Every structure is written in structure tokens, then in C-alpha cells.
Amino acid sequence: MKIPVDKSRIPSGVSLFDKITSVEIEKEDLFKLGISKHEVPAEHVLETDYLYLLSKVSAYIQLYSDFITVNGNQIVNCSTDDRVMKDVSEIVGIALGLKLTIDCFGIRQENISKIPPPASKQKYLDYKFAHKRKNIELETKGTTSKYISKFI
């Protein structure tokens, strides 16, 4: 599916998004990217967090695939349970945010890592990666309020 980028939401003077007019993503990619929201156990046996999470994607698809419908360039949350609606919203929001980041910066998913929560209860961003000798942190959004509703 091809989702157009809403340029009206980008602050003026930010040229990073100039070359991106749309994001192309398949339904399965929503799960491959959306699974990044999960914590990786400290004692996992695979060599990278990315490989650990990738090994869980098929289970993730089995759990949530029936609640996501793709119609053209629309993604529909088909759940009626508010908890599942929130999970689906987070999966889609995180996946689209990471996909846009991957396309804009020309990086691979395995180069993005989740930022662990700080010891103190302060705010922090979700993910980080290195690009051109700079450390970049980003925030993705899956839910927009405490009251989740269906999205199209």
C-alpha cells in the first residue's frame, strides 16, 4: 500500500522530508516494524535485539492480523475491544513512524534500537540510531489519546 505523506504537518524549513512524498508498506511489514514496541529480555540468546524480535513476528501476525484490514491506501482497525484497539493502533503508528524514518534516512530496521526507560521517572524518546556520525532519537505515536477509537 502507498500512503501519502501529509506535508502540511511538517514544520517549514525541514528539508529532510522533501524527497519523500509517500510511504510504501505491506501489511506484513506493519508487524515486522510494529514489533519494535516490545521489550527484549535481558538474557535473550540471539546476537541482536533485532533478530530476537524478528523471531517473534509470525506469532505477532497470528495475534493481530485479523484486526487490521488494508483497503487501498487505508488501514482499518477492526477490533471492538478497547485494549486490542490500543495495541493495533500502537503497532500501526510505530510501524509507519519507523518506515518513514527508514525511508528518510536511508537506514535499515536493524540499525534502530529501542531506548530503555531511564532510572528516574522522566520523559524520554522511543528509539535511537546513528546517522552520519550523529546520534538521532525519535518518537513514534500509536495512540493519540487515552480514549482510543477506530481509525481509518
Annotate each PLM feature.
Residues 126-146:
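Conserved catalytic cores of phosphodiester-cleaving nucleases, focusing on short active-site segments
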